Amino acid sequence: MTSRTFQTITVETDTRGVARLTLNRPAKHNALNGQLIDELKQAADLLASDDSVRVVVLTGEGKSFCAGGDFNWFKGNAAADRATRIRESSKLAHMLNALNALPKPLIGRIQGPAYGGGVGM
């Protein structure tokens, strides 16, 4: 099994080529923030180009799959200038597109609540 190190997600691939992509902010119910969005995009790009990966399972650590957007992240974006709001929105769109366009089957293993962006994934 191989794994890659991130702060807000974990990525592990077993010997069968099954990659487990786990949202790892359980104290925040895996709510999306800028860092989680960036790391999901990076992981999607890595998994897409890894020929040893045959399928990706997306799940969340803890009681919730994903509570949607982190309110502190929303609050910070609301107070930011227009260019920052556009940049943050674009990062979210690119991450969702990277997951949607993954050239391997993507299976959602949803445990517990999924709201907002968590439903979108």
Where are these regions (language model features)?
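Conserved CoA-thioester-binding segment of acyl-CoA-metabolizing enzymes
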Residues: 1-61, 97
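Histidine-centered beta-alpha loop that forms part of the nucleotide-sugar donor binding/catalytic region
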Residues: 24, 69, 111
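Residues that form or flank phosphate/diphosphate-binding pockets in enzymes
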Residues: 31, 66, 117
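Generic recognition of short, well-ordered alpha-helical segments
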Residues: 34-35, 69, 120
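Glycine- (often His-adjacent) and acidic-residue-rich active-site loop
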Residues: 60-98, 114
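Glycine-rich beta-to-alpha active-site loop
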Residues: 95-121
